[in-house]
Amino acid sequence: MSLSLWQQCLARLQDELPATEFSMWIRPLQAELSDNTLALYAPNRFVLDWVRDKYLNNINGLLNDFCGADAPQLRFEVGAKPASSLQKGAVSPAAAAIPAAQVQTARVAPTIVRPGWDNVPAPAEPTYRSNVNVKHTFDNFVEGKSNQLARAAARQVADNPGGAYNPLFLYGGTGLGKTHLLHAVGNGIVARKPNAKVVYMHSERFVQDMVKALQNNAIEEFKRYYRSVDALLIDDIQFFANKERSQEEFFHTFNALLEGNQQIILTSDRYPKEINGVEDRLKSRFGWGLTVAIEPPELETRVAILMKKADENDIRLPGEVAFFIAKRLRSNVRELEGALNRVIANANFTGRAITIDFVREALRDLLALQEKLVTIDNIQKTVAEYYKIKVADLLSKRRSRSVARPRQMAMALAKELTNHSLPEIGDAFGGRDHTTVLHACRKIEQLREESHDIKEDFSNLIRTLSS
């Protein structure tokens, strides 16, 4: 029995799993076959537990498919594969089975013979300004389907900085939790290693620091500062657009940090390749580690966010009230929290109980604006324009993929962004049955997990309709 068995499993798993999941959880595994036992080595306990919980049945099923009654037993271990099992010049089984161009982790940083994370001697200078907000942690980040992968990736980076997911690139619309996760990673790293030099900043601060260094003839000090941190967390990297000198300096800083196994985490409001005004060589490097999207929170997550926020403020928020708010405000977490703050303030000022009628009154203008902005008619026009078809096509009986997929997308958006029932949505799409609408919604939900393009389309349309 040879390692080709694991390579066969990898090939099948790559076909069956979304690219991000495969890159994040399966690709880091190393395998060793011995005495009819397949040992899988995970880089840390977090990955081991996740793989065993989520993918154990998939892997066992593949082993049975390939080997039948002779299928090896499966064993999980934390750490690197024993040196005795490594053949000189051999590549990782995962790397051999997976063409780099097929996954989002298009390049894994090589192991550099340099001081690693745990033994870099601390420089005598300069003094580091962390700017990490201690209030933003993993514990108070509300997890849901829309952000589950992003949170898991961030947690793993906090536990193993400078490891497989370097850089980590988080992208999504405004107010979805990207900044919270940046701070949570910073806090997690410092909790693990109190003396770690972790620096968080907005990309504009990097530009300002560089300009100031040039003005003061202190560019070498600038380079030494940014290239000797243990973790650099930069928010809204899209603001580097058209700033050529800043991009040039960040390019060299990025390379220096990566070669030193120092962690880089970046956020943006869009996918790396879609950032205009940024050099291709930088955009390429942004995708070298792991790229994960954060989508607008689904209804259940929005309710959970409201309940947690109310609990943090010692406010009793009835479940039906949280549901009422969450059903009507859908674009992002910041909008939800702002609405709840207004409700709480009004309740404190008036001494009234928080009920649905009270919330309807307190948020009257916000709710009216939301209902005015997002209608089925508006969704149909926006989707038709996005896919370059006619609204009449969405209402027609045509079943070609070029029309059917946009129609399904529009139906799913109508369910997500309006209060209309399934029969009402069906009527608005040429008198279709509610079961057709339900099928469309489920199909788009499935495709969002399997296809990066569909996930991007959905997020872009949500952002357009909610802005």
UniProtKB/Swiss-Prot annotation:
Region listing for Domain II, in residue ranges: 85-130
Keywords: ATP-binding, Cytoplasm, DNA replication, DNA-binding, Lipid-binding, Nucleotide-binding
Binding residue positions for ATP: G175, G177, K178, T179
GO biological process entries: DNA replication initiation; regulation of DNA replication
One annotated Gene Ontology cellular component of this protein: cytoplasm
Entry's Gene Ontology molecular function annotations: ATP binding; ATP hydrolysis activity; DNA replication origin binding; lipid binding
Region (Domain I, interacts with DnaA modulators): 1-85
This protein's record includes keyword DNA-binding: yes
Localization annotation: Cytoplasm
PROSITE patterns in the record: DNAA (PS01008)
Mitochondrion is among the record's keywords: no
Gene3D superfamilies: 1.10.1750.10, 1.10.8.60, 3.30.300.180, P-loop containing nucleotide triphosphate hydrolases
Region span, Domain IV, binds dsDNA: 348-467
Location, primary (coarse class): cytoplasm
UniProt region (Domain III, AAA+ region), positions on chain: 131-347
Comment field on protein domains: Domain I is involved in oligomerization and binding regulators, domain II is flexibile and of varying length in different bacteria, domain III forms the AAA+ region, while domain IV binds dsDNA.
Subunit structure: Oligomerizes as a right-handed, spiral filament on DNA at oriC.
PANTHER family, alphabetized: CHROMOSOMAL REPLICATION INITIATOR PROTEIN DNAA
Family membership noted in the UniProt record: Belongs to the DnaA family.
Reported function: Plays an essential role in the initiation and regulation of chromosomal replication. ATP-DnaA binds to the origin of replication (oriC) to initiate formation of the DNA replication initiation complex once per cell cycle. Binds the DnaA box (a 9 base pair repeat at the origin) and separates the double-stranded (ds)DNA. Forms a right-handed helical filament on oriC DNA; dsDNA binds to the exterior of the filament while single-stranded (ss)DNA is stabiized in the filament's interior.
Record's protein name: Chromosomal replication initiator protein DnaA
Gene name for this UniProt entry: dnaA
